[in-house]
Amino acid sequence: MMIHNIPYKIYGGQNFYQRKEIKDILAYLKTIDNGLDGQAVKRIINVPKRGIGNTTIDRLQEYADFNDITFWEALVNAKDIDTIKNAALSKLEPFVDLIGRLRAKEEFMSLKELAEAVIEDTGYIESLSQNETVEEVEARRENLDEFINKVVSYEEGCKEAGEEPTLSGLLEEVALIGDIDNLDYS
């Protein structure tokens, strides 16, 4: 309906981009893209669970605020923060390394491959299996597959327009679609 500009409203359903698994993968992609969105970084710092506590997150934010830097920059420099204990550092560093590896992959992967790498490298599906029923995990997997299809559509649309698909461009398009989905046509 959106493709043909037909106004519609979902009753009793949930906007695709408001689903937990879609918000999670988008937060990973935003963090890979530039790390400027502190909320995105905070959303995924414990997805899947890494044992990073709220106190550590608060201390990172305080350091970021005091030094006028982003939350991500504070996270990268966590070893320089006196109030962050070694035990917390040992949990933060693998997360920073993971994002670094995914950023390196962005250089030579398609966006589809990058999105799949996020799901695979983070162990996202496996982590869902620990807390949800088989049916819930399968529904989330199907939503992630649909997201991958949307990424492929974005890449194909760019190629048809003679443009290079970029992660920033994908995220901008998703933001626009999310805004359109939230419009009230009544």
Predicted regions and their residues:
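Conserved helicase C-terminal RecA-like lobe
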Residues: 2-7, 19, 26-186
